[in-house]
Amino acid sequence: MDSDTSPNPFASSPPSSPSPRPSLPPPVPRKPSSLVSAASGSPPPTHRASFPDPARHPKMGATVPGPKPKTGYCCSIDKDISAGEQVHIVDALKTTEGGTASYITYVIRLGTHTVRRRYSAFLSLHQSLTGLYPVLIIPPIPSKQSLTDYAVKGQSKAREDATIIARRKRLLEDFLQRLIRHPILGGEHVLHRFLEEDVSWSEVLHSPPISLLSKNPLHAPSHNPTFQPTTPTSPSEAPATTSYIAHHLLPTPSPSHPLRQPDQRFMDSEAFTEKFQSHFSGTMEKVNRRVTKRWGERAHDMSELGGIWNGFSLVEQGKLGDAIEKVGRAVDAEYLATAALLQSWEKTTTEPLHIYSQFATLIRARLSFRHQKHVQYELVQEALETQRDKLEILENAEREARRLEEALERGGSVLASPQLEPEAARDERERAQRRARASQGFGLLSAVKHSLSGMIDMDPEATRRANIAKTRDNISQLEDSYQAAAQDLKYASMTLQADLDRFQRQKVADLREMAINLSQVHRDWCKQNLEAWKAAQAAVREIDPHPNRPAQTQTQVQSQQSHAGPSTLHAQTEDDVSKLGVDAMKNEIERVEIEIADKPLPKPSLAETGGDGVVPSPQPRQENDTEEQEGHGPLGPL
């Protein structure tokens, strides 16, 4: 890995999060927790220590209380989940219950419980959990059908496509499995009711706690979004009502609003999530689609090639025809193995990559929500400082007016006001600068308003006192909102960081499993092809050898096979064929040389002997040869 790679901010846990634990043995039944979930009052699993406890009151001020503790399991579904039961979607059925149009329902099984839910119920469950837990990472669900599918296939065929239904079954099952394994979401009673048979999901959606959710999650407590005020019957219940009002008075900032003092830890998390999303969505998914497309094209070509070989086998007879048929079968087997590889590839690689691309989008939404909570805190803090400065100015003016009034009553002597001390003057300048920043863009309007109010006001003293009272009321409300925003920001930061730590450990385990599954898919593909081509090789060896090449003995073939390993068998076979051709050529040359050596040399003719039967000896070359003296060689002039 490159040295300039930024560190992973998800790996740094806050003090409330424990260090990653080693792999645990199979789940064992757990005892019910005395804590309850923040939304519906159902007990979460016991291993939720890394998350802040919403049942505890925060240290600063009296705010919205958390859920009340309870004992025991809330239902049989909760007990089965605690015992380690797994959830599965075992079937998808076409039905017309409750209407005239047909739709697909998915059969969910958890232990002995079986229930049928349609896709819209899964979608509403995801939306409900997102509202109940605005700072937790809710697992994604498969997206709806695209408009292109409806346009090409039609509405009914797109819904009933077997490939789409099978993919949805796997992705929806993954969604439910991630929910029940979550340390907080697994104890949510809304999820239990979704998995419980004979429960109308429509009634669940229109009953508490889902019906108590606020339309704007920024105006609700992060740790208890379903909190509703009641008429206080005792002084201890009054702060809860006050905090409820304070939450609804909080501003609604934009997600792009800048922060004056951002948290560096979450800035790193946002940058890491953006790179994580870009890497999965823009790089890995794109390359994965290209690779699977090429594998699919190769499978199509192998299908055509297998048909050609099988057709050719009908033309030939005997051992050659059998060998050609076996080669065609091997090609067909490779086509089938590639098709199986693509199916397994989609389950083990394509779908997990898409799930984590969706996870990146969901994490960015949770980080954006926490960012808005931080902006709320800073805006309320700034407004509170402005109102306090305004109150101080009004109170100073009131004291100055009273001092002048008392001086006039004592004798009309007007005392000069003492000069401000250097520190007081500096504080006054800072307050003036803050007021200028707060009223930036409204300077002319404020001046005109102040002038008009001065001309119209008939009793400035009463107006000033009314402004003081109104400012004090505003400060009181802002202090309540400031406490509520501070509590929300603290809980959102701690909970989101703890869930990011949990997600990081889960991501590492999932990517490891994905890599192992991908290697196993390729291994199985290679095994199937090897078996098919071994059968074809055995059939090819039964064909008679080439007439121009010496045939190998059975002993030579067996010795070569025994010394050759599986990985080098194919390469050695090609080398043997080439060596056989060279050896045959050498043998032919040696045979011709032997025949020539055994034949007697022919006798010289009369022309060569000069008529006397004696072959003349060659004349030696003269050193002073005329041609050489003239500069001529045997090939011409030099």
Curated annotation (Swiss-Prot):
Membrane topology summary: Peripheral membrane protein
GO cellular component, one term: endosome membrane
Residues the entry annotates as binding a 1,2-diacyl-sn-glycero-3-phospho-(1D-myo-inositol-3-phosphate): 118, 120, 144, 168
Keyword Membrane attributed: yes
Keyword Iron: no
Chain segments annotated as coiled-coil in the UniProt record: none
Compartmental location: Endosome membrane; Endomembrane system
The protein's name: Sorting nexin-41
Organism: Cryptococcus neoformans var. neoformans serotype D (strain JEC21 / ATCC MYA-565)
Biased composition (Low complexity): 1-14, 225-239, 552-562
GO annotation (BP), single: retrograde transport, endosome to Golgi
